[in-house]
């Protein structure tokens, strides 16, 4: 079974220092796994989703690629608008990502009883995840997981 490591910035790391935070983590774990995932989409780390913006995502993906020899995937949120999704996919592709992981959990709890903070997965997310997968497949030739 291939072992992958999902990387995310520390909760105390400022957004402007995120690329270096990912690089440090990459250097520590890259030799232990078969692939890495740039996770910029978890709703549970304050500010993490802002890293899906092209200005951050390009540097983060490039830093992870530069500090490892294993394939690097980028994991995106299902809550991105189509334009944001397109920008993120384009940047990930240009930065050398091996594929896109679509999607992480959603922060959209519309129509669901109050379940508290954090991401939601499962059946309520399935329709949107399928929409994102279809959209990403039209945007890139990269594999989609």
Label each residue range with its predicted role.
Residues 2-4, 67-80, 136-145:
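Short beta-strand/loop segments at the ligand-binding rim of alpha/beta enzyme cores
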Residues 22-30, 54-65, 85, 89-90, ...:
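Generic structural signal for well-ordered alpha-helices
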Residues 33-35, 69, 97, 141:
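A structural motif
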Residues 1, 51-76, 115-130:
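P-loop/Walker A phosphate-binding loop and immediately adjacent motor/lid segment at beta-alpha junctions
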Residues 9-22, 49-50, 73-93:
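Active-site glycine- and acidic-residue-rich loops that bind
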Residues 1-37, 42:
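Active-site beta->alpha loop and helix N-cap motifs at the rims of alpha/beta catalytic domains
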């Amino acid at each position: 079974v291939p072992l992958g490591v999902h990387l995310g910035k520390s909760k105390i790391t400022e957004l402007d220092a995120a690329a270096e935070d990912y690089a440090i983590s990459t250097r520590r774990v890259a030799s232990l796994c078969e692939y890495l995932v740039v996770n910029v989409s978890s709703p549970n780390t304050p500010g993490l989703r802002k890293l899906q913006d092209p200005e951050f995502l390009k540097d983060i993906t490039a830093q992870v690629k530069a500090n490892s020899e294993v394939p690097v995937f980028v994991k995106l949120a299902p809550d991105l608008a189509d334009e944001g999704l397109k920008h993120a996919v384009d940047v990930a592709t240009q930065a050398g990502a091996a594929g896109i992981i679509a999607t992480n959990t959603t922060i959209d709890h519309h129509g669901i009883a109050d379940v508290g903070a954090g991401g939601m997965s499962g059946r309520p997310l399935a329709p949107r995840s399928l929409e994102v997968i279809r959209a990403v497949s039209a945007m890139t030739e990269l594999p989609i997981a």
